[in-house]
Amino acid sequence: KIDTERLVERQQFDPTLLDPLLRDLLGEPGILPDRERGQGSGVIINNNGLVLTNAHVVERVDDVSVTLADGTICEGQVLGTDSITDLALVKIKESNYPHFAPLGNSEDLEVGDWAIALGTPYGLEKTVTLGIVSSLHRDINSLGFSDKRLDLIQTDAAINPGNSGGPLINSNGEVIGINTLVRSGPGA
């Protein structure tokens, strides 16, 4: 699980709504600092503590923490993001990680292969859903995302908010993709 925080400034209220007499008495409304929190998923991909996740999970954040499967909370550092492919690398600031997910080859996939989505939807840790590969090379532009360059694997494994950044794995336990988006609403 990946938790993020960023400092944002919010105006207390719209100054145009303040009566001019009250404004003279109280002064101009100030700006309040606030912490915005986010959550997503990720997967450790080597024994040096590199975590692969989505760029939209960790972009423009001040703090990143990674909760491991055993409940250990580690400080993370964003090493890089690519908003075009929606991928990011986070380095866990700890030592050795003997357990990490092997990377598979998505080019070996066929429609009908098993697809297993892991993540923390709605903050529910260690969630696993099962489905199949429904389509390969799905064009994201057809979904209205013209700013991305993704070659999508479509699956019917349940993906929900918070699954973003979590691994999509094959029946051999190899990472074949990173859960990125959910299509919902009419026609989904």
Task: Annotate each language-model stretch with its function.
Residues 1-188:
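Serine-dependent protease modules
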